């Protein structure tokens, strides 16, 4: 009886388990809304409020912008993050505390891209050394841009000590927010860029470290498709499942801004051909990655 009550109290977790499966397989998609497929489950819940901007009636405040990031801009932003941002020592990555990372033109990405994937990167302390290939494909999970979120304190430090926010990403996201919402003075101040491979997941959570939770969160999807779950402020209510594609934008405003959300499944073999260049290293990476840019304004405008 106790187990049954616990399951009832965490319906969200049951839905996460429903869609999580072996990395190389695809789960039952019969109850997944695909914004790009009018025949998909629950498509009628999407309402176009502006050109290519859709509200989702089951998650008040959630906006879905289909194919909003052009293929050219996707490539530009992906190259910027890999060739410029991760080699900047001011931008933290999940690897930074554990490895003696080479930076600048000798970064792990540039070594990988230039065919030196078998070179060894030494660990710090008791961390074992690993090859560049393994670090790039398996171990690199995130990088922070702009104001550097402190994962230990769950806070943003003094903004005066943070690196500047990347202009290309900031300009685009601010334009998207102004075109799609009433937040005309919203500023891109911080971002977490997540790198997912098939088999990776993001558990249910609410983003609540920012000072003003009425300000929207913006998510850009690139690379592999994913299943995205969006619920309410309670884990006891069943979330909706959506399939997000490369180039889609999700904006969380209103009630959805404080809703539990998760990514239980990365869909293999779904990277669009326009992100492939013919370069073996690049194609081998992007064909097995979902890159998610999650951008936010940290504190109210003053």
Curated annotation (Swiss-Prot):
Residues at which Fe cation binds: 205, 207, 261
InterPro entries attached to this UniProt entry: Alkb, AlkB-like, AlkB-like_sf, Oxoglu/Fe-dep_dioxygenase_dom
Domain of life: Eukaryota
Needed co-factor(s): Fe(2+)
Binding site for substrate: 142, 149-151, 235
Keywords, comma-separated and alphabetical: Cytoplasm, Dioxygenase, Iron, Metal-binding, Nucleus, Oxidoreductase, Translation regulation
Reactions catalysed, as given in the entry: an N(1)-methyladenosine in tRNA + 2-oxoglutarate + O2 = an adenosine in tRNA + formaldehyde + succinate + CO2; N(1)-methyladenosine(58) in tRNA + 2-oxoglutarate + O2 = adenosine(58) in tRNA + formaldehyde + succinate + CO2
Cofactor mode of binding and number, as noted: Binds 1 Fe(2+) ion per subunit.
Name of the protein: tRNA demethylase abh1
Species assigned in the record: Schizosaccharomyces pombe (strain 972 / ATCC 24843) (Fission yeast)
